[in-house]
Design a protein with these regions (language model features):
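C-terminal outer-membrane beta-barrel translocator/porin domains of Gram-negative envelope proteins
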Residues: 506-508, 548-552, 578-595, 608-610, ...
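Surface-exposed extracellular loop regions of Gram-negative outer-membrane beta-barrel proteins
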Residues: 521, 532-534, 556, 562-565, ...
Length: 889
């Protein structure tokens, strides 16, 4: 049962009856599988149901309403008609049609040849109805939403018409679509939500279940793809028949967003975008012929369960590609006619299709259902022979074989279509059929050369111009025009799986030495996976320089600065792995990184190794730093890192453990190594969040780079280089980052994170009268905690902010120790250092309609208490303040 409140009315969806009668079928006899939070498997039968409800409720459900005139007389039905409410403002409070008087009504239903019964009830339901071919098409809409559901009953009729034509006749007397804040299917009843036109794909999907889950009765507990995947295919197919090839969406309110929002193909939105996300981005492929409970250990829809929707839909689209549309339609209609009300299994489906077509399609079903093979074809060399004869070479890089449709575009933009069969079957086509290409995998006949007499020069060659072939790398399916270059508008558009996507935008930045910097940032990728890069180039103007010492030559700043980040997938060789590279000459720092990473199959664990090198080799390079005393001048800081990062979830919380081993390499300037471990946990306890961080490091070496040492109060200079706000002075005054005999005002999360000691040298007098300064070291441990309480006070985040700006106050406490001995000697640890206080963050988490812009967090901490007083302070408890950008951890 699902229950929710709407405008002080209780809404009921009574569904998923359990326990239920066990199904006996031809495969398993008595089917006794446990229910694992997926759909049920039920047998066909007849249901006679009586439901008694308070008098003011409006209800409907599976089957024929036997006493309609009793519970819904004509006078009441007219009052409930949706047309009476379509001019009401959307989401305005409902009226009262029937007053609650303490009496009850009994609704009587009879349903024949169904495997389940469900009903829905709500006092605010209003009714729209259309009739199609004797079938009642009923829309049950909550009155506040009527303005968004005006066309619902007519849309139901269209879906019934198209599905009955393409799949097979609908065998029940009615179809209900209910406004129920859901997306679920039951015989003759679908629970949906949203509004037109956004709800159209949802309505089609849930209604289409009535063919595959409803009338065919596939065992979704066993093989979910036979229902969800087939339904997903026809969701896209039916949508196109009704509304055309592009998704119908509401016009954006912003002219800027409208200008840069690209139209979306129905096939992409409903099938291919998600298919490529699974197959290429997340690399979560499993064979479709997998038990429904084997995805993510049977827990809901994770662990690649989405493949039963989109990989199956892509399989059927590729079966259409293999057979041709007309032949495919007839085969699917035969399957429905043969197996309706009969509980088929995967072998029944493939035998039905093969038997009807008379075509050996075992190679197709074996690849798509039983393996994780992928399609990947490439256009190779195009060789111009004499007399306008061309040789075009194709290469099969993937392990799945398919027939090939391709088009040749000549210099006059005329198109010539060709078809290369991959078996003895040849589909009906208007294209020129070439000799068949029979091969297997990437090694048995992996190349094919087509010899074509074009009669003129070739301009381009494109594999599958219909974009149906589920090729996992479309960038090599076209000879010219593989790259799509566009303005980086930061307006959301789905990923472009057809071409390599490049975005360019202007960029302006600032620091106190370069002044204003003007340049551009370019980024690009194929599905966020292959050849992912971001590069920036700026010219420094010197305009607005600030905080410069009189000894600094104001025009000695670096005139040009740049960075390049690059990463690409190595999935072809090692699953879920990447190689990455970074080069930069930015704000006085020349640095480079090259590394390798590998993620676990569930993406929770990442192991990595990389070599990182840094150098500041000019006097002016030191001017950029917030603290210019904490970096080795003209010293190469080069180190190898090996690490492991693990993310986990638990009840009411999430956590991350990071282990990093580091050792100097390829440098004579430093000798150091360190082992670091940190554990961060964020616990959501309702209106209070408790965040904790446990940190430890052991360091070794005789010559340690100051910029990479462990700092008591926060991040070291090396870590500051990862933030554009902190890598240079100017955004914040440089004197805030200096160390002295009092605390200071700059804070950045990292190190031991004892924020109350920011800027304090932590001097400790030795027996011989000398001093040690404990603000940095090589070995230490700390515990940090923050208790956030902003959700207790609604005024902290008022509605007008629309979740764009978030204010989060908290209480914090930090405790830690650090080594006090000189480098290369036995570790001697400091006394425990403690701070405590209050703080708040102001985070801009959404930038209006702009997409994919990182949040900005400004942090203000007031450590009222520290247990080691600076020389110039007298009270452990007093007002101190620190300002930083980004959270402490």
């Amino acid at each position: 049962m699902k229950l929710f409140n709407s405008f002080s009315n209780k809404h009921y969806d009574i569904v998923h009856w359990y326990p239920r009668i066990t199904v006996i079928d031809s495969k398993f006899a008595w089917n006794t599988d446990q229910h694992m939070d997926h759909e049920f498997y039920g047998d066909f039968g007849s249901f006679n149901v009586e439901i008694t409800l308070p008098n003011h409720y409006v209800a409907d459900g599976t089957g024929t309403l036997l006493n309609e005139q009793e519970v819904l007389p004509d006078t009441l039905r007219k009052k409930l008609d949706i047309n009476n409410f379509i001019k009401k403002p959307y989401n305005s409070p409902p009226s009262v049609i029937t007053k609650k008087d303490g009496t009850k009504k009994t609704w009587k239903f009879s349903a024949i040849n169904v495997h389940d019964f469900a009903f829905t009830a709500d006092p605010t339901y209003r009714i729209g109805e259309t009739n199609w071919d004797g079938v009642r098409c009923i829309a049950l809409v909550q009155e506040p939403h009527c303005a968004g559901w005006v066309n619902c009953s007519k849309y139901i009729a269209k879906v019934l018409e198209i599905n009955s034509y393409n799949i097979g006749p609908y065998h029940h007397p009615k179809m209900i679509v209910a406004d129920a804040q859901d997306g679920m299917e039951y015989p003759m009843l679908t629970l949906c939500g949203g509004f037109d036109p956004e709800y159209r794909s949802l309505l089609i999907h849930e209604m289409t279940h009535n063919w595959f889950q409803g009338m065919i009765g596939s065992n979704e507990n066993y093989r979910a793809f036979m229902d969800e995947g087939f339904t997903q295919f026809y969701t896209a197919d039916t949508y196109q028949y009704i509304d055309g090839p592009l998704m119908i969406e509401q016009k954006p309110k912003s002219n800027y967003v409208e200008k840069f929002t690209e139209p979306v193909r129905v096939l992409d939105d409903q099938i291919y975008n998600s298919f490529y996300a699974n197959a290429v981005i997340r690399n979560e492929e499993l064979p479709l012929n997998t038990h429904s409970d084997d995805f993510n250990g049977g827990i809901r829809h994770g662990g690649g369960y989405g493949q039963v929707y989109t990989k199956t839909a892509a399989m059927l689209k590729n079966l259409e590609y293999v057979l041709g549309r007309s032949f495919f339609d007839k085969a699917m209609q035969h399957y429905f006619k043969q197996w309706k009300f009969c509980h088929p299994y995967p072998e029944d489906f493939r035998n039905s299709i093969i038997g009807f077509t008379g075509v050996d399609l075992n190679w197709f079903f074996d690849q798509w259902l039983e393996t994780t093979k992928t399609v990947d074809y490439k256009i190779g060399r195009i060789k111009h022979k004499k007399n306008d004869v061309y040789e075009i070479t194709f290469k099969r890089k993937g392990s799945m074989q398919m027939p090939i449709d391709f088009v040749v575009i000549d210099k006059n933009d005329s198109a010539r279509h060709y078809y290369i069969p991959n078996t003895w079957f040849e589909k009906p086509t208007g294209a020129t059929t070439l000799p068949r290409w029979i091969g297997w995998g990437p090694k048995l006949k992996p190349t094919y050369t087509a010899t074509l007499n074009i009669g003129t020069k070739i301009k381009n060659v494109i594999i599958d111009p219909s974009y149906r072939l589920a090729d996992v790398d479309m960038t090599n399916n076209i000879k010219h025009g593989r790259i799509n270059v566009r303005f980086d508008s930061h307006v959301y558009n789905p990923l472009n799986w057809k071409k390599y996507d490049v975005r360019i935008r202007p960029s302006v930045w600032y620091n106190g030495f370069d002044g204003a910097k003007f340049g551009a940032v370019m980024s690009g990728d194929y599905l966020l996976t292959k050849h992912v890069f971001e590069a920036g180039l700026w010219l420094s103007s010197g305009l607005g320089q600030a905080y410069l010492d009189s000894t600094v030559k104001i025009n000695s700043f670096n005139k040009v600065s740049f960075f390049i980040d690059y990463k690409t997938s190595l999935n072809r060789y090692i699953k879920k792995s990447n190689v990455y590279l970074q080069l930069k000459s930015l704000d006085g720092l020349d640095a480079g990184t090259i590394g390798f990473e590998k993620r676990s199959n569930n993406n929770k664990t990442r192991v990595y190794t990389h070599l990182k090198a840094m150098l500041r080799d000019m006097p002016q390079d030191m001017v950029y730093l917030i603290n210019d005393q904490e970096w080795g001048y003209r010293k190469l800081n080069s180190a190898i890192h090996v690490g492991l990062e693990h993310n986990y979830k638990y009840k009411r919380g999430v956590g991350t453990v990071l282990i990093n081993l580091r050792s100097s390499a390829f440098t004579n300037d430093y000798d150091f190594s360190a082992a670091t471990i940190s554990s961060v946990n964020k616990n959501d306890l309702g209106k209070i969040n408790i965040n904790t961080r446990l940190f430890g490091q052991i360091g070794f070496g005789n010559n340690l780079p100051s910029e990479s040492m462990l700092y008591t109060a926060g991040a070291n200079n090396e870590d500051l280089m990862d933030s554009k706000y902190n890598r240079s002075m100017g955004i914040l005054p440089p004197n805030w980052g200096n160390y002295g005999n009092v605390t200071n005002h700059f804070t950045a999360g990292g190190g031991l994170n004892l924020r109350g000691f920011s800027g304090y040298l932590l001097a400790q007098k030795n027996a011989d009268g000398s001093f040690n300064y404990n603000y940095k070291g090589a070995t230490g441990a700390a515990f940090n905690t923050e208790i956030e309480f902003g959700e207790l006070f609604k005024f902290m985040n008022p509605k007008f902010m629309k979740n764009s700006v978030k204010i989060q106050p908290y209480i914090f406490g930090d405790a830690g120790i650090i080594n006090t001995n000189p480098a290369g000697t036995a570790n001697v640890m400091s006394d425990l250092m403690v701070d405590a206080g209050v703080g708040t963050t102001l985070s801009i988490v959404r930038w209006g309609n702009l997409y994919n812009i990182k949040p900005l967090t400004i942090r203000f901490d007031v450590p009222f208490f520290i247990n080691r007083l600076p020389y110039a302070e007298n009270d452990y408890f007093q007002f101190r303040w620190m300002l930083g950008i980004n959270k402490s951890f």
